[in-house]
Amino acid sequence: MSLATKLRRVRKSPPEGWDLIEPTLEQFEAKMREAETEPHEGKRKTEINWPIFRIHHQRSRYVYDMYYKKAEISRELYEFCLTAKFADAALIAKWKKQGYENLCCVKCVNTRDSNFGTACICRVPKSKLDAERVIECVHCGCHGCSG
């Protein structure tokens, strides 16, 4: 879905400062369209969605950084981005909590999706894992977001 379509769906004109973040969000939309149409021959079933998860993470991190770290956008614009689903509100809420600052996706901390009621392997600290083993999250392809 294009950026213009999402804006029409919100039925509200974007707040002041939109022109500052619009070009970057357009680039993320173009990357997302490219990742969605990318051929998936030769990939495992779980690997197909990994580029989409990465772009989604980057886009949410961009909006988060612009509001919380750099303070370059207003609260009104930040909330507009969340309601228009340009950024993932649940993921940003986790980033604000201690220990989840580098979380890759919300699926990795959702214990309902796992067989044993535990978090994803990418949430295990690297110091507690073998150095030779390559760890990849099944959900998003993360190599370890816990530190």
From Swiss-Prot:
Keyword hit for Nucleus: yes
Keywords on record: mRNA processing, mRNA splicing, Nucleus, Spliceosome
Cellular component GO terms held in the UniProt record: spliceosomal complex
Short name of one Pfam family: BUD31
InterPro entries: BUD31, BUD31/G10-rel_CS
Motif annotated as Nuclear localization signal, chain positions: 8-12
Main location: nucleus
Subcellular location: Nucleus
PROSITE patterns: G10_1, G10_2
GO biological process: mRNA splicing, via spliceosome
Function: Involved in pre-mRNA splicing process.
Quaternary structure annotation from Swiss-Prot or TrEMBL: Identified in the spliceosome C complex.
Sequence similarity: Belongs to the BUD31 (G10) family.
Protein name (Swiss-Prot/TrEMBL): Protein BUD31 homolog
Source organism of this protein record: Caenorhabditis elegans
